[in-house]
Regions:
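Glycoside hydrolase catalytic-domain context in secreted enzymes
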Residues: 1-370, 374-383, 399-421, 429-431, ...
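Solvent-exposed strand-to-loop "edge" motifs in beta-rich extracellular domains
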Residues: 112, 386-391, 444
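Edge beta-strands of extracellular beta-sandwich domains
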Residues: 450-455
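Short beta-strand-plus-loop segments that form exposed binding edges in beta-rich domains
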Residues: 440-448
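Extended, low-complexity, turn-rich repeat/linker tracts enriched in Gly/Pro/Ser/Thr and Asp/Glu
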Residues: 389-398, 447-448
Length: 466
């Protein structure tokens, strides 16, 4: 069959390429995976595109996104620049400076193989109680739009892009999944849409994120007028629209439902973010909606065209076609040893009991060594068991430091065991899921041998998909 590179090289049209894809392939393309998918850069927000062997066989790469409005969020411990927040940028009134700053951020995205930043945030400052106002630029739609466009232009100079969010009227955090914004058309056009319109028309934004909540009766991820009429027909937008993470949608007159992905497909919200497994057809209503005619294959193909069109212009496609410059490849080789280890990270899955077993016999545990690994877990409280030994005497002190998602967890000081194996068990805490988390262990002394580490499932807690 044809490869996506054949579209890039203009040997075939995008429609000819998409015609090869099965209904199942099209549904999988609609679903992103995350957070921290092992199929893309460790510690990032989502993966989308070529997430299965079937899609990879068509030459579709997995593209990557990560937060956010204050710089790259890399939860595995990779260092990144912290940027001034959106309000601070707005206070400069300096478009040239902001554009240059985001050109540098675009280079950082390229270095970390991230295709789209999940920002800028363009919601209007409406209430001082909004806990995320710092991410947003101002109460002025013109300033907001101009600053958003400058960020997108800067990212584009470096060959990257951003995702303007949250479209639209996400102006408070309390009860944001349910609170309804009731707004007149004039207020929407003049205030709440204006920043997005400027960023699309002047900044050539290629990625938009919808909100969690409803606007005038419809949850925005399933709002056809918002995602198709206003965004694409009125403004000429040609990129992708994605949901916020684990967002709901509804059909007019019905309650919202996290499984109602058919409403998103119909509205041209191209990507649902996120799932733990994009190939799982039981997690939403797409199969039954296609069978009973609520959605059509043509609508799935339309969404796929948007997604693949975005990927064609992304760094992921350049890597897929081996078209990355020698300079960029050399720059990636300049990472620290710790960053290089993160690139080669190993992921461990939970078993049927919810436990995660991590073998440690091959680890380098010399003083100053660092081990990083990923774990895929459900939302639960966990204990941690460390089975180890040391040839040293009982008076020896052997400290290790545990980090989870780059946040300090605990320092444990073991004693020498004269070669005898022992198991240390203690509370580890709550891990939210379904998601991947990153564990880092720093060894503060030489002389400790690790046999294994086991995270023991204790009890379930509400997770991202509840």
């Amino acid at each position: 069959g044809y490869k996506l590179a054949d579209v890039y090289n203009q040997k075939i049209t995008m429609d000819e390429f998409i015609a090869q894809l099965s209904d199942e392939d099209l549904m999988i393309l609609f679903r992103g995976e995350g957070m921290c998918s092992p199929k893309v850069t460790p510690g990032t927000g989502s993966a989308f595109g070529g997430l299965t062997e079937s899609l990879r066989a068509f030459g579709i790469p997995a593209a990557c996104t990560t937060d956010g409005p204050s710089g790259l969020r890399l939860d595995c411990g990779t260092k990144a620049f912290s940027l001034p927040n959106g309000t601070a940028l707005g206070c400069t009134f300096n478009l040239e400076l902001v554009e240059k700053l985001y050109e540098m951020t675009g280079l950082e995205l390229r270095k970390n193989r991230v295709d789209a930043l999940l920002g800028p945030g363009l919601n209007i400052h409406r209430s001082p109680l909004n806990g995320r106002n710092f991410e947003y630029i101002s109460e002025d739609p013109l300033l907001t739009g101009k600053m958003g466009a400058a960020q997108i232009i800067g990212l584009g100079i470096a060959g990257s892009t951003g995702t303007i969010k949250h479209f639209s009227t996400n102006n408070q955090e309390a009860h944001r999944h349910e609170v309804e914004a009731v707004v007149s058309v004039r207020a929407l056009r003049e205030i709440y849409f204006r920043g997005y319109e400027i960023s699309v028309k002047e900044g050539q934004a290629r990625s938009v994120m919808t909100t969690y909540g409803p606007m005038n009766g419809l949850w925005t991820s399933g709002n056809y007028d918002l995602n198709t009429i206003v965004l694409r027909k009125d403004w000429g937008f040609e990129g992708i629209v994605m949901s916020d993470w684990w967002a709901k949608a509804n059909t007019e007159g019905e309650p919202s439902d996290m499984k109602n992905h058919a409403a998103m497909v119909m509205a041209q919200n191209d990507l649902f973010m996120v799932t733990s497994d994009a190939s799982d057809q039981t997690q939403d209503n797409l199969v039954e909606a296609l069978a009973d005619g609520r959605i059509t294959r043509g609508q799935l193909q339309r969404n796929a065209r948007n997604i693949l069109g975005f990927i064609l212009k992304s760094p992921a496609m350049l890597y897929e076609m081996d078209m990355i410059s020698e300079e960029e490849l050399e720059d990636r080789k300049g990472d620290t040893e710790e960053d290089a280890a993160i690139d080669d990270i190993i992921y461990y899955e939970s078993d049927e009991k919810g436990d995660v077993y991590i073998p440690g016999k091959d680890w380098d545990t010399q003083m100053g060594a660092t081990i990083v690994f990923g774990i895929n877990v459900e939302s639960a409280e966990y204990d941690i068991e460390i089975t180890a030994r040391s040839p040293l005497g009982e008076l020896s002190q052997l400290p290790i430091t545990l980090y989870c998602d780059n946040v300090f967890k605990e320092m444990i000081s073991f004693r020498g065991s004269q070669g005898e194996w022992f198991t240390d068990k203690r509370e580890f805490g709550t891990l939210l899921g379904p998601s991947c988390h990153y564990i880092k262990i720093y060894f503060g002394a030489t002389g400790l041998e690790i046999d294994n580490i086991t995270l023991r499932y204790r009890k379930r807690v509400p997770g991202f998909d509840d």
